[in-house]
């Protein structure tokens, strides 16, 4: 056996050495440029591979729990229909109560309007001072008609007739002045 003719670890042919150097340079450049990205990508792929089988097993167990028995399907549909009917009846009952309440409120409003109209015909105030079900006392309505006239005559003004809060008259510590006319910044001058 001739040992000189066989390629060994130190005696590689030229083409093999060139290919090895080319591969080493290419891999080295790629790893030096994108090494961290490749590492993070590998970690993400590993985590996804760990999570995906768990999701598939969850989906598989939920598929197994569905019933394919036709009788069970019919029972479930009947239960759903019964629940819908029950909810619809409750909704109809609530709607009926709401309509009755609205009719009652409309009737109360109509009664108040009639009372207001009657009071206006009698010459009394149009505003109803008493609550529903209470009768206004006649003594308060007659004395109230004469009293406001006396109060108006006796009432004295709090400030002088020349008081104007915008001009500052009246002894206040601060006086308001109107601002300059014209644009506040630049413009034609």
UniProtKB/Swiss-Prot annotation:
Claim: Transport is one of the keywords in the record? no
Transmembrane segments annotated in the record for this chain: 29-49
The record's keywords, sorted A to Z, are: Cytoplasm, Endoplasmic reticulum, Membrane, Selenocysteine, Transmembrane, Transmembrane helix
Query: Quick one: a GO cellular component term?
Result: cytoplasmic microtubule
Superkingdom of origin: Eukaryota
Q: Which Gene3D superfamilies match?
A: 6.10.250.2950
The record describes its membrane topology as: Single-pass membrane protein
Q: Which InterPro entries match?
A: Selenoprotein_S (IPR009703)
Report the record's Gene Ontology biological process terms: intracellular protein transport
- Give its localization: Endoplasmic reticulum membrane; Cytoplasm
- What segments bear the compositional bias annotation Basic and acidic residues? 114-125, 148-157
Q: Which Pfam families match?
A: Selenoprotein_S
Ranges of biased composition (kind: Low complexity)? 136-147
> Per its UniProt record, what PANTHER family does this chain match?
SELENOPROTEIN S
**According to its UniProt record, which protein family does this protein belong to?**
Belongs to the selenoprotein S family.
What exactly does this protein do? Involved in the degradation process of misfolded endoplasmic reticulum (ER) luminal proteins. Participates in the transfer of misfolded proteins from the ER to the cytosol, where they are destroyed by the proteasome in a ubiquitin-dependent manner.
What is the name attached to this protein's record?
Selenoprotein S
Species? Xenopus tropicalis (Western clawed frog)
Tell me the lineage of the source organism.
Eukaryota, Metazoa, Chordata, Craniata, Vertebrata
């Amino acid at each position: 056996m001739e040992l000189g003719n066989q390629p060994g670890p130190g005696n590689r042919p030229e083409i093999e050495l060139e290919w090895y150097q080319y591969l080493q340079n290419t891999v080295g450049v790629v790893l030096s440029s994108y090494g961290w990205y490749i590492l993070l990508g590998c970690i993400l792929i590993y985590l996804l591979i760990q999570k995906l089988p768990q999701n598939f097993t969850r989906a598989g167990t939920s598929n197994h729990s569905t019933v394919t028995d036709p009788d069970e399907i019919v029972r479930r549909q009947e239960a759903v229909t019964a629940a819908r009917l029950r909810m619809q009846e409750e909704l109809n009952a609530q709607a009926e109560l709401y309509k009755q309440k609205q009719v009652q409120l409309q009737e109360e409003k109509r009664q108040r309007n009639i009372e207001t109209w009657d009071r206006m015909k009698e010459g009394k105030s149009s505003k109803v001072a008493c609550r529903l079900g209470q009768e206004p006392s006649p003594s308060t309505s007659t004395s109230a008609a004469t009293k406001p006239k006396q109060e108006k005559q006796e009432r004295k003004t709090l400030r002088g007739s020349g008081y104007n809060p915008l001009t500052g008259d009246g002894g206040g510590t601060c006086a308001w002045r109107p601002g300059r006319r014209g644009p506040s910044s630049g413009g034609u001058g």
